[in-house]
Amino acid sequence: MNATIFALLLLLNLAMYNAAEQSSETDMDDTLLIPENYRKGCFKEGHSCPKTAPCCRPLVCKGPSPNTKKCTRP
């Protein structure tokens, strides 16, 4: 009985592995590419830039003092 259960689990594992492998094959046309310049969590030009989140590329965090830094072009 233990051998039967083991064999069934092995077959189920192989079936799930094959299904997962086939579903992971995607075309680049089907995927949505997000530009790195506007990734989630970055600040746009003119926004104050605390240490918690970076400025969107190619912007840099500049300012005369740490409290007045803003995202600006380099």
Curated annotation (Swiss-Prot):
**Which segment of the chain is annotated as a signal peptide?**
1-19
The UniProt GO MF terms for this protein read: ion channel regulator activity; toxin activity
- Comment field on protein domains: The presence of a 'disulfide through disulfide knot' structurally defines this protein as a knottin.
> Which superkingdom heads the taxonomic lineage of this protein's source?
Eukaryota
Write out the annotated subcellular location.
Answer: Secreted
As for what it does, the entry says:
Probable ion channel inhibitor.
Q: Which UniProt keywords apply?
A: Disulfide bond, Ion channel impairing toxin, Knottin, Secreted, Signal, Toxin
Which GO CC annotations does the UniProt entry carry? extracellular region
> By what name is this protein known?
U5-theraphotoxin-Cg1a
Q: Which residues are propeptide?
A: 20-39
Q: Which family does it belong to?
A: Belongs to the neurotoxin 36 family. 01 subfamily.
Q: Which cysteines are joined by disulfide bonds?
A: 42-56, 49-61, 55-71
Tissues expressing the protein: Expressed by the venom gland.
